[in-house]
């Protein structure tokens, strides 16, 4: 708001101008609305699909909230999540288990006022845009958008094992895991922000079943000293052998806007700062063996 006095004559004039009072009356009492939606679909023993949605418009608030406490943004989000057992597509005798999980979530927040000119509502700024490109650019700056996706296969395995005495080469000893997480964000100060994480792992675990070697068990002497000796034995194989190999990769990329030049109007809406990024790759390996060599049988 600007107040002033203009002299339309050619003569120079002097005077005093007093502004005694500036008052705002009648708050903008327009209300808003909100809605939630949920959907759950069960696909027999194959899995399930869940969908949720939520929307909150500007001006929404609780009954006890004042005008200043009400939201000034339009916010919308939806999410779809599915969990499936892909092993159901294989014959039962194959004993295949492939638990699959996938989800996608999208959020969008649109402010009421133009972030480049907070005295103007966003819809008025879009209407005043001179071209479609300028309109799209203003909308991309004003709105904050977040997209997240998750995909994973956890402990996929083929449960075929040798009966009674599991062998080290049985397919049931192996399991495989893979996951990918992705997030992409755009907003007022961020042209885009990207986060990615990949993980792959292979696990092996073998627990042999065997009878311990007890060389003195057959002694029939009733001496208590020999009785103690009879309870000793030797486990000639470990109780469990396991190893794990895991590879992870993380990637991060951030492209920020040059807000100083953007707010001053000395550059276009596509002005940006230097790109920031980071990347990490890890390969972790773990081996474990559980072996109680000596066996002692407690008296019954």
Model-derived segments and spans:
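Extracellular beta-strand ligand-recognition surfaces/modules
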Residues: 1-12
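Transmembrane beta-strands of outer-membrane beta-barrel pores
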Residues: 7, 26, 55-59, 102-110, ...
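Outer-membrane beta-barrel translocator domains and adjoining extracellular loop/strand segments
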Residues: 11-14, 61-68, 109-121, 128, ...
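Hydrophobic, lipid-facing positions within transmembrane beta-strands of outer-membrane proteins
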Residues: 33-37, 76-82, 147-153, 198-204, ...
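Short loop/turn motifs that connect adjacent beta-strands in outer-membrane beta-barrel proteins
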Residues: 45-46, 84-101, 110-115, 154-174, ...
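Outer-membrane beta-barrel translocator/channel fold
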Residues: 55-77
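Conserved small/polar residues in nucleotide/adenosyl-binding loops
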Residues: 296-300
